[in-house]
Design a protein with these regions (language model features):
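Amphipathic alpha-helical segments
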Residues: 7-8, 18-99
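Proteins with a high burden of low-complexity, intrinsically disordered sequence enriched in S/T/G/P/A and R
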Residues: 1-4, 26, 105
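Short N-terminal segments immediately surrounding and downstream of signal-peptide cleavage
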Residues: 1-17, 143-145
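Amphipathic, charged alpha-helical segments and their helix-to-coil junctions
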Residues: 86-147
Length: 147
């Protein structure tokens, strides 16, 4: 665990730790990881681009009071964004299946959830660890399933 780390990680270091976490949790071989992560990272980039559009609109709504029509437009955009992301995930599921098993894809999804939970837990830690430099990034899990 990174309980002693209170440094801001570069995007590359964060991605490296995230990939190590997912690889270990899903028990990917080196060959599987080498084939899987370029596809996975492409999906994540496309999802981020969609989310950036919505977050920009949400930021704008906090900076100035919008009328009802603008809030309606914002909510419709959020809904359309969720649908677009779901569609991307379905498309990429087919691509993931070409390089790893459904079982390992499922484990990746589970690992993503656990990784996020551990990030949030790190942000809530007494003393505000990570507050100045962001949350500590979880290390790859052990194969101890009692977590």
């Amino acid at each position: 665990n990174n309980s002693g780390d209170n440094i801001r990680l570069s995007r590359e270091e964060f991605q490296k730790r995230h990939e190590a976490y997912l690889t270990k949790f899903a028990e990917l071989t080196a060959d599987e990881a080498a084939k899987f992560f370029p596809i996975y990272n492409e999906l994540e980039k496309r999802k981020q681009e969609l989310n950036d559009q919505i977050f920009g609109a949400m930021r704008e709504s906090r900076e100035k009071d919008l009328d009802e029509a603008k809030y309606k437009e914002l909510l419709e955009g959020m809904s359309a964004n969720a649908i677009a992301i779901e569609s991307l995930e379905r498309t990429y599921l087919d691509r993931f299946k070409e390089v790893i098993s459904y079982k390992k894809i499922f484990k990746i999804k589970e690992a993503e959830s656990r990784f996020r939970q551990e990030l949030v837990r790190g942000m809530r830690r007494p003393g505000g660890e990570g507050r100045a430099g962001g949350p500590p990034v979880p290390d790859a899990p052990s194969n101890d399933r009692r977590r």
